[in-house]
Amino acid sequence: MAPPNRLHQKIQQTLAWSIETYIRKNNGSCEVYPAPFAVFLNKDDKTYVEPDISIICDKSKLDDRGCSGAPDWVIEIASLSTKRTDYGVKLFKYRSAGVREYWIVNPLTKTVNVYDLKKEELSDQYSFDDDIQVCIYDNLMINIAELLK
């Protein structure tokens, strides 16, 4: 697989920073981990995924290897080489494992699919210019275009 391009890295960096800043300002307990960071969804030692960004609120899931169990919020940044996996296999895996919120950020179409997995539905599809309400945080709105300025 090809390494992520510059825009992918910029989106990953600015999103992680924005979420981390919000958590710190609000004295939150969740932790933000950009890739590379192993997530063992089935709590075994063999099978893991590396989401572009993982937000974990239950610190008992964290150990030296990464996260054992489902993160609360996962963000994947789609590319031509990962699109099929991000929209198919990973959506199924994250839903089955108990991830609460899943975002697929697509730099090619400049859209963000937000899945509220507790409601088991696609909440909405947004453009980079939209203010996107985060499902797990009532007071957090993210605008990708603003982050990329």
Predicted region positions:
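Gly/Pro/Ser/Thr-rich low-complexity, intrinsically disordered segments predominantly at protein N-termini
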Residues: 1-149
